[in-house]
């Protein structure tokens, strides 16, 4: 018979039979003599507490060094010496390690911690039932109400005590399937069903007794099952050996019993002449001097251990008896049918509450004054969506097309996932982008919030379609080679109570901070309590959910400043590192971001995370091991703000080239990880205007001066996009419609506009001809430049010519040379621009071409330029180029001349 003496821990996940095993072996002292019999010494004495703590501290610092962990590593690398901020990073690192220890006290590993959706919410269990679980520590009673039980708060309630409510506030409710009329209950109490396949092994007709007999026959060797069949034989024999054949039968007769070591020595003395085969294979001596044994440090005979690992496990009887879907449907009526409506019922100290479950995956918002409800989404195997395509490989550079599904159609209505899949995805592919970023996908009560006041974090918005519709969107995008990113909002949540998380269980501090700290200073939204382990469990599981369930490829974390600082980012900064470690910094929020990035990148190595932080917190894109937050990219928010300021407030001839360059390449240390954009949804949606609306919105080409205004607008629109695209990092973003100069802003239906949809759409018809067709052609050429030439992945730009007087900027990136003339009137026949390599340079993009809406002033004889041996701009050679006003040119070194 085999013996298992390693400590084993099992973690069971719902709806599967995956068993996670963790073993720890700690041997204090072992001595193996040459003879067969082993003598093993087990030290169980406890060492003084101070010595243990000292040793633990030393081992932690040693393990950090061995793992290459340095809490201030990026400060050292950048040569930043700030004692206060460095101390803040060290303390944050220590607090993060303590947080991980707390996590491991309640969760098996990080995968378990990030997979709360496998347990929480509503799930079909294999044993013909539905399990529901949710968190409500402030409630005294929990139940599920829905159309399947007549909305009764007593029909399906949590059981009393720990069977229905644990110490952490989680409620567990079982909804048993109902036997059909004339059907008998299952013979086996553990009978399982396969809800996907029509038939399984249990439908073969083999009885449970036969399966158990087969399991025993295959597992036990002859004679090994003797003590299983006669379980009292061993203790009776031991009792007889210890106390003799006429052993006492009562405690009074037993008298005093010598200690274990004395009895063992007596027994050995009595059996000293026995053959070795009759003696135990090992001697265990307790040197703990009466102190408790260390149950975690257990040693076994190598022979026993080898035999255990060589032994094949018995056949899993629960799989052998599992029946298929047809048997289940024949015997049972589902407790919660597909499409059922339900809510969570709480009884609190202030009275009863009905809530949409926090982990609900499909939610219908309030309609016509009715309360919102969750929908149980469990389509049949035939109707459920089946994935067709694998995920695309992550490209070296990202060209992201930012979208909002609801306004993606040309009609004045809320568009759907299905319409977006059919109409917008092919356009994105044709336009040359390699990723889409979706905003407003998680469920939100109010459409006019653009999806930034999330109410149900695990549910795709039902106003766009079903969960399977969203799966189809992601799958078709992958089929076109497009990555799919979500604009995720974990920096705050909607303040709605009936459908959101606010006052979820009746208490004011369930998911959010209590009092003023729990409310955004300006937006009225609720602020998460990131220091709470259960809130972290919710948020990190939410990140893992969208990747696991919907196969998304990454996230842009929205408005990090709102969560990192208790003032929500609305404060003046002194450009001092003290701003990032003072009393207004939420260390718990920072640790959440670190933990989220660490877990996501381990669980999903190809995931992309993007940080949107207006304060550019130090270390955003540094590795977690070096004291950073672990993001892959950060958003350069300053560029779009600069362009809007120039267009609105500064005359064309007063634009500063130095300011443009310093803003576009603000942080050279992290320029490679910068995501740039000229305009995103903020310029079009958040009360602003798109560049096209500013530049030529309402301009009549036939009116006096109209053509000049239109030409100016077209030229600047192209130049702004070209210089932003080519001077940034390895990622670029554009909002839907701006690539062709959408002439109108976005305005969602609200009470102020009589709930009009007239501006909540996109004018795709403008692509066919005219100005918008020219602008689209130019933008497509930009994307093709990166697709075919790899512009964005060729290292950082080398900016060598910035002339504020002439309003000319020039820089190189690999073998490519970019030249911009922003002057509103001055053209230059032979403008000297420095180049390092002598040779021939061919123009590969000219913003003045007629097909891009230009004037066609630059003719073909200007397309090939030969360098002149003349030192300019710190370069050894130069080009003499023809630069019309408000034009841009891109050259490629096609032939190198060696002298």
UniProtKB/Swiss-Prot annotation:
Top-level taxonomy: Eukaryota, Viridiplantae, Streptophyta, Embryophyta, Tracheophyta
Quaternary structure note: Monomer.
Pathway: Glycan biosynthesis; starch biosynthesis
Name of the protein this chain belongs to: 1,4-alpha-glucan-branching enzyme 3, chloroplastic/amyloplastic
Observed phenotype of the null mutant: Embryolethal. Embryo developmental arrests at the heart stage associated with reduced cell divisions and abnormal cell differentiation, thereby leading to defects in setting up the shoot apical meristem, embryonic vascular tissues and cotyledons. Modified starch composition. This phenotype is enhanced when associated with SBE2.1 and SBE2.2 disruptions.
Gene assigned in the entry: SBE3
Keywords: Amyloplast, Chloroplast, Glycosyltransferase, Plastid, Transferase, Transit peptide
Keyword Plastid carried by entry: yes
Outcome of swapping residue 366 to K: In be1-3; reduced level of BE1 transcription and various developmental defects during post-germination growth such as shorter primary roots, delayed greening of cotyledons and leaf development, yellowish and small leaves leading to smaller plants with altered petals and sepals in flowers
Record function comment: Catalyzes the formation of the alpha-1,6-glucosidic linkages in starch by scission of a 1,4-alpha-linked oligosaccharide from growing alpha-1,4-glucan chains and the subsequent attachment of the oligosaccharide to the alpha-1,6 position. Essential during embryogenesis.
Tissue-specific expression: Mostly expressed in flowers and inflorescence, and, to a lower extent, in seedlings, roots, stems, leaves, siliques and seeds.
Provenance organism: Arabidopsis thaliana
